[in-house]
Amino acid sequence: SLVEETLGDSCDIETVKNIHEKMNEIAQEHKEDPEPVVLDKNEVKTIFASSGVANDRMEVFDQCFDATAGEATSLMMTNVYNPRSFEVKTPDVVIKVNPERTDLVNTKLIDGRQCLVIELDGNIEVNGITVRAAGSGDREESEE
């Protein structure tokens, strides 16, 4: 994908989340438009730069955009991001997040291990069973 190719080894969840959130804002601004949202190279470049993409990776952006867009000078926004889902996958876990609530997902170093942290808000279900979040009497994880 354009995002993955542009970011290369510096592709991290925070940057991808920032790009998704900015794309989602644009999608919301145009949700009444009958035509799909189209972004030119400069618009996508601005979104990437303001989402925290490093300057050295922005130098790669032009060739990645041209390879993705081909002869076109613009891309449909859905070629850059999926407005219907925000999914985090590891080999053992798949987490689907409301694409408008990516703010609930963060990464954090806990006890020396990189962890995905999801803010729990409202009802929680595990396999269709309503459960409660750990209470305030439980031990909180230490941060390093």
Stretch-by-stretch model annotation:
Residues 52-53, 57, 66-67, 72-144:
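C-terminal, beta-strand-rich globular interaction domains
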Residues 1-84:
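Long, hydrophobic alpha/beta structural blocks
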